[in-house]
Amino acid sequence: MEIPITIGRATLSDLEEIVAIEESCLSSEEIVSYEFLEESIRKIADTFLVARDENQLVGYVLGESQSLHPTWIEIRSFAIHPDHRGQGLGTLLLASLKQVAVEGGYEYLRLTCPDDLLSYFEMNGFV
């Protein structure tokens, strides 16, 4: 029996699991500080989404609106736990963030990524 993945807004109770995923996935240069993540949950929870497999947090995407470009959301951090990659969770999270952006009146999602991830994001509609 397959367990459905649920997508929801990040809460402060998710913070430790988010940090653990970051540390398991990202290099020290890419890791966002605990304080930034906590502040993001408090201030921009609408665009900070988490994926859960039952009670376990398995991935997240953090989007932040830009004051210079109020119709943009910039993806600041995005990670899927290594044990859950290749199952479409990243695509599901990105699609969910796109839906939140449309519902919020945003026109663009923006991100920067290493060259080796370009094809992944292109596959998910980024150009």
Task: Locate predicted features.
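Conserved GNAT acetyl-CoA-binding A-motif
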Residues: 101-113
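Conserved catalytic-core motifs of GNAT/GCN5-like acyltransferases
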Residues: 112, 122, 127
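Extreme N-terminal starter segment of soluble prokaryotic enzymes
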Residues: 4-6
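Acetyl-CoA-dependent GNAT
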Residues: 9-13, 20-76, 81, 94-96
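Conserved glycine-rich acetyl-CoA-binding loop
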Residues: 56, 81-92, 104, 116-119, ...
